[in-house]
């Protein structure tokens, strides 16, 4: 069953209906659902689908030829075009009088095996686009390759595309459609454990508990997810050992460049290059305090929840897992799970605020959201604000998120209001997010202030319906 991607499908179908040449670039990290999106889109349409393989030019050209000829003749073909130029010319002619889709999946594999393919595509597009109704789709999992060799200004195909789509992991709302059999609370835990990558969500069984799902995947050496982070690095980068060391450093609390460099034993210049690649892969993110464009206070953290959970709990327990001690390891994880979920809940709350903005329900229409941390000069202490967002120099929203098994008390609201005093806004609105709820004192104060919104986790879940 295909779930989600409504916006992407709407765009693709709109381009399909244009009845003229279209060239769409689709890219995104592995397992995110690009192939599923393409297959769902081309279903019941006249389409040639070809997936490149990590092989030589001869093998890929043979496979490409078969895909095109079988579409054109309706019979299995043994003929191979003499070149990609001849194959593409045939595909363009097939679409002279009717809409035909040509989808080339894993394009980087094909292009790496044939160095002239990009230029051949460019020439074919320029020659035939005005007299063809072909809809060309190039799709790739190597994001750096797609960005540098397809989308970049110096790439041969630059300026030819009519649309591009970077396919991102699902947000929390979309993930919940995969997890309908779970309780509302368990949906949050599963999102925190695997994130929004469809292939990882499919490893979760919504008829089992969170404990059973963790044991069956991360604590099972024979499972797909147990080896996934290292396998993914081996597929994406040339020196997986160094990348693994950097991710491990970040996962163990070394968040600043100098700390990562010291932990890994490489210069900051070297680490910077590796971190840049990890950011492009969607594994690591770089944050600066909200409102500060360039800051020495920048920190790095793991963005992908599957990577974050794996690196926090699997490596240190690898020996016990290998000996089949999943019950013991789970007890260790369970004691830290609510603490781990704190950052996940902030992510869910951030998505909720964006949803309020997009539906016209935000009291202050911010232009962006982020975390803030820094020095409180009044108290000479380092402080944090979970979420803040500015509309303009006069107005902003502030939020605090608490994932804990107790009601949020008045002191949390008072602390947030106090910290907002470090900024010079004249109009402010506050959000308190709570897993469980709020004390009577907190609720009464919020009502009295008039510029406070109290949101429980259940409120967030109900907003999906």
Where do the language-model regions lie?
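Phosphate-binding site recognition
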Residues: 1-330
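A cross-kingdom feature that marks ATP-driven nucleic-acid transaction machinery
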Residues: 290, 299-465
């Amino acid at each position: 069953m295909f779930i989600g991607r409504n916006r992407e499908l709407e765009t693709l179908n709109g381009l399909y209906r244009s009845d003229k040449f279209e060239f769409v670039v689709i890219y995104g990290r592995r397992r995110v659902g690009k192939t599923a999106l393409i297959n769902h889109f081309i279903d019941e349409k006249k389409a040639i689908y070809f997936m490149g393989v990590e092989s030589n030019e001869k093998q890929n050209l043979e496979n490409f030829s078969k895909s095109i000829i079988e579409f054109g003749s309706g019979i299995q073909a043994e003929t191979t075009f003499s070149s990609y130029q001849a194959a593409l010319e045939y595909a363009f002619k097939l679409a002279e009088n009717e809409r035909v889709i040509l989808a080339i999946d894993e394009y980087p594999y094909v292009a790496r095996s044939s160095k002239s393919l990009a230029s051949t595509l460019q020439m074919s597009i320029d020659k035939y686009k005005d007299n063809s109704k072909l809809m060309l789709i190039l799709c790739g999992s190597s994001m750096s390759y797609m960005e540098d060799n397809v989308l970049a200004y110096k790439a041969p195909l630059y300026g030819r595309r009519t649309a591009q789509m970077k396919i991102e992991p699902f947000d929390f709302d979309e993930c919940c459609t995969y997890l309908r059999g779970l309780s509302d609370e368990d949906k949050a835990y599963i999102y925190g454990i695997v994130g929004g990558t469809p292939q990882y969500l499919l490893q979760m069984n919504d008829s089992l508990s969170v404990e059973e799902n963790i044991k069956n995947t991360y604590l099972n050496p024979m499972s797909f997810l147990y080896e996934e982070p290292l396998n993914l690095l081996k597929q994406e980068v040339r020196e997986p050992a160094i990348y693994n060391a950097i991710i491990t450093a970040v996962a163990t609390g070394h968040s600043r460049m100098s700390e990562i460099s010291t932990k890994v034993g490489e210069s900051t210049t070297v680490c910077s290059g590796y971190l840049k690649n990890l950011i492009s892969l969607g594994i690591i993110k770089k944050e600066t305090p909200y409102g500060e464009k360039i800051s020495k206070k920048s920190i790095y953290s793991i963005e992908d929840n599957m990577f974050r959970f794996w690196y926090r709990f699997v490596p240190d327990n690898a020996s016990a897992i290998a000996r089949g001690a999943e019950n013991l390891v789970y007890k260790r994880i369970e004691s830290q799970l609510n603490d781990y979920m704190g950052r996940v809940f902030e992510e869910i709350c951030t998505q909720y605020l964006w949803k309020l903005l997009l539906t016209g329900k935000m009291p202050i229409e911010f232009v962006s959201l982020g975390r803030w941390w820094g020095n409180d000069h009044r108290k000479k202490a380092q402080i944090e604000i979970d979420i803040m967002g500015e509309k303009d120099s006069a107005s902003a929203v502030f939020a605090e998120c608490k994932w804990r098994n107790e009601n949020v008390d008045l002191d949390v609201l008072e602390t947030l209001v106090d910290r907002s005093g470090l900024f010079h806004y004249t109009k402010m609105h506050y959000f308190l997010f709570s897993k469980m709820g709020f004390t009577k004192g907190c609720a009464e104060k919020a009502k009295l202030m008039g510029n406070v919104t109290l949101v429980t986790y259940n409120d967030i879940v109900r907003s999906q319906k």
